[in-house]
Amino acid sequence: MKTYIQLLLAALFIPVLSACEQEDDVIDIFTGKTWYMTYIAVEGQNKMYDFWQNDQDAREKSFKTITGDNYTLVFEGANVNDVAIGTFSGKATSASVNGDWSANGDNRELKITIKNGGGTDGDKYLGKAFMDGLKSAFKYGGDNKNLYI
């Protein structure tokens, strides 16, 4: 019986001893893939924000632009002193952008510095929101399958 209790206690403590760190693997999350925008939402919601103010024709026209290489981001980088840093490039529909980025896995702080591009996009709704979102990004969430900026 004593051996059984010892084995049970050992089995219960193994997960505690091998618990994962709470810090994100930022390089795994951001790099090695092309990120495609699926929607732009208000924080805490998972549906597309109504940039079109109920203008269904404008909405449909914008949604048709979410194809191919439109609304994409590619991050390259490395981990330096526990902070991921690198370069990025992105594209809305007609406007392209590139620059530097850094992210902290402890507090999920994100800094994006646009060096080139980031101007007016052909789609005045989603394209504008995509570019404005990059300019004002300060935090990220997600994992290596979903990225929220």
Residue ranges and their predicted role:
Residues 1-2, 21:
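N-terminal hydrophobic targeting signals that begin at the initiator methionine
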Residues 2-10:
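Sec-dependent signal peptide recognition
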Residues 11-12, 138:
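Intrinsic disorder/low-complexity segments
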Residues 15-19:
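C-terminal motif of bacterial Sec signal peptides marking the signal peptidase cleavage site
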Residues 20-149:
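Lipid interaction determinants
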